[in-house]
Amino acid sequence: MAIKKYKPTSNGRRGMTVLDFSEITTDQPEKSLLAPLKKKAGRNNQGKITVRHQGGGHKRQYRIIDFKRDKDGIPGRVATIEYDPNRSANIALINYADGEKRYILAPKNLKVGMEIMSGPNADIKVGNALPLENIPVGTLVHNIELKPGRGGQLVRAAGTSAQVLGKEGKYVIIRLASGEVRMILGKCRATVGEVGNEQHELVNIGKAGRARWLGIRPTVRGSVMNPVDHPHGGGEGKAPIGRKSPMTPWGKPTLGYKTRKKKNKSDKFIIRRRKK
């Protein structure tokens, strides 16, 4: 999709950009694949904030997405490409030959009317899902499983892709979007192609109100808080941090401090760590 720029008719419009939604073919989602979505505002089951800067925003309905891609051997045809307010990628409605309808993540270059398939014998073409062991080296993939049958967990955001680098026994070597190279069980499924809507990251929100429509609340710097609220708070005027390294609101070091567990069970599957 192309990016649309506005003329600076006001301070809020100056610099604002939006996607033109030229790929979207309908604004009416499939009702049978909708579920209610209650807002959590970043709170857990105790009512405590566990994720800051969340709350408000436009009311949404959840679109039930097929991350497992387990409908083997039955061809499906792309009926629509739709906007999904719950993720950065677009979604595609698939009408299967047996009458079932499912949503999938819309890969780049997937068009209405194209046919897709799942299963070990599916062709290597955009939108088809098959086990990693059946995908040729060099192929770009997305929606990758970490355990067979669990459903895709990796590489689901707009514009992302991973590459199959090689095969070693029952494992397949994958380079992820972060630069990390890791081994994943060959029985795990992935979808061929890159995730669509790749220009999503280039959109400039433009004004605070638009962020609030998206459910994003303001981010307040620790240095302008009181000492009771943040380790950076207090002092007269623009005071320095007063510590040897920046801290989180809970007093833990941040900005470069490693938070990954020293003895993580998945370390044995990582060949090369992500780029810094």
From Swiss-Prot:
UniProt keyword annotations, A-Z: Ribonucleoprotein, Ribosomal protein, RNA-binding, rRNA-binding
Record has RNA-binding as a keyword: yes
Gene Ontology BP annotations: cytoplasmic translation
GO cellular component: large ribosomal subunit
Gene Ontology molecular function terms on file: rRNA binding; structural constituent of ribosome; transferase activity
Record SUPFAM superfamilies: Nucleic acid-binding proteins, Translation proteins SH3-like domain
Bias (Basic residues): 258-276
Matching InterPro entries: NA-bd_OB-fold (IPR012340), Rib_uL2_dom2 (IPR014722), Ribosomal_uL2 (IPR002171), Ribosomal_uL2_bac/org-type (IPR005880), Ribosomal_uL2_C (IPR022669), Ribosomal_uL2_CS (IPR022671), Ribosomal_uL2_dom3 (IPR014726), Ribosomal_uL2_RNA-bd_dom (IPR022666)
Gene3D superfamilies xref list: 2.30.30.30, Nucleic acid-binding proteins, Ribosomal protein L2, domain 3
One Pfam family per UniProt: Ribosomal_L2
The keyword Cell wall biogenesis/degradation is annotated on this UniProt entry: no
Positions of the UniProt region annotated as Disordered: 224-276
Job of this protein: One of the primary rRNA binding proteins. Required for association of the 30S and 50S subunits to form the 70S ribosome, for tRNA binding and peptide bond formation. It has been suggested to have peptidyltransferase activity; this is somewhat controversial. Makes several contacts with the 16S rRNA in the 70S ribosome.
Membership in a protein family: Belongs to the universal ribosomal protein uL2 family.
Assembly, per entry: Part of the 50S ribosomal subunit. Forms a bridge to the 30S subunit in the 70S ribosome.
Protein name per Swiss-Prot or TrEMBL: Large ribosomal subunit protein uL2
Organism encoding this protein: Geobacillus thermodenitrificans (strain NG80-2)
Taxonomy of the source species: Bacteria, Bacillati, Bacillota, Bacilli, Bacillales
